Amino acid sequence: MDILLVEDDMTLFKELSEELEQWDFNVNGIDDFNDVMTKFESVNPAIVIMDVKLPKYDGFYWTRKIREVSNTPILFLSSRDNPMDQVMSMELGADDYVQKPFNTNVLIAKLQAIYRRVYQFSLDEKRVLSWQDAILDLSKDSINKEDHQIYLSKTEMIILEMLVKKQNQIVTRDTLITALWDDEAFVSDNTLTVNVNRLRKKLADIDMNDAIETKIGKGYMAHG
């Protein structure tokens, strides 16, 4: 599996690369931190590991650029003890977040969980779902409503798929977290909240503001 490791600390880059390669990850680095996108497009990685603090442009900037062209999963690394970094990364479309210093085994567990849910997760063979007056194309991570189309991240689409398949029923937070992150012991409860809020903002763009209801203390429900 190809990994793009966007990390300017060469000591950490070398240590991480050696550890990840023992787990059959093929690690690619950045030659020019002024042009991360060229390397991203040439490698076409399965997952991006993105440091927050980088030369010239930070990891948030490059995440925005990547999200303009791709839904490739992104895991953030940060040495800053700032909860807003985690919130910002999730709002930009990151899939997970690890604060430095970290246990390498935790990082590997997160990478493996991301790979399973993004590339192997499927509730059944049907790839198109009808919901209210919209069509979910699961293969393209898109929603079509009348003449409007929006695109979701892999995480957002999995959440919505699970909710839509249980329309008018509560899907618990624990059920969603377990399906999305197999290593849920390492996941902040806020991570799911941020992803659901981001999904709601996108649905609002196609006039589906109240399509997902929060059931306080329980979970979420998609109205049919």
Swiss-Prot record:
Domain Response regulatory residues, every copy: 2-115
SUPFAM superfamilies xrefs: C-terminal effector domain of the bipartite response regulators (SSF46894), CheY-like (SSF52172)
Classification via CDD domains: REC_OmpR_NsrR-like (cd18159), trans_reg_C (cd00383)
UniProt-listed InterPro entries: CheY-like_superfamily, OmpR/PhoB-type_DNA-bd, Sig_transdc_resp-reg_C-effctor, Sig_transdc_resp-reg_receiver, WalR-like, WH-like_DNA-bd_sf
Short name of one Pfam family: Trans_reg_C
Post-translational modification: Phosphorylated by GraS.
A Gene Ontology cellular-component term: protein-DNA complex
DNA-binding region: 126-224
Compartments where found: Cytoplasm
Gene: graR
MF (Gene Ontology): phosphorelay response regulator activity; transcription cis-regulatory region binding
Positions bearing 4-aspartylphosphate: D51
A biological-process GO annotation: regulation of DNA-templated transcription
Protein keywords: Activator, Antibiotic resistance, Cytoplasm, DNA-binding, Phosphoprotein, Repressor, Transcription, Transcription regulation, Two-component regulatory system, Virulence
Function comment: Member of the two-component regulatory system GraR/GraS involved in resistance against cationic antimicrobial peptides (CAMPs).
PROSITE patterns noted in UniProt: OMPR_PHOB, RESPONSE_REGULATORY
Species this chain originates from: Staphylococcus saprophyticus subsp. saprophyticus (strain ATCC 15305 / DSM 20229 / NCIMB 8711 / NCTC 7292 / S-41)
SMART domains documented for this protein: REC, Trans_reg_C
Domain of life of the organism encoding this protein: Bacteria
Entry protein name: Response regulator protein GraR
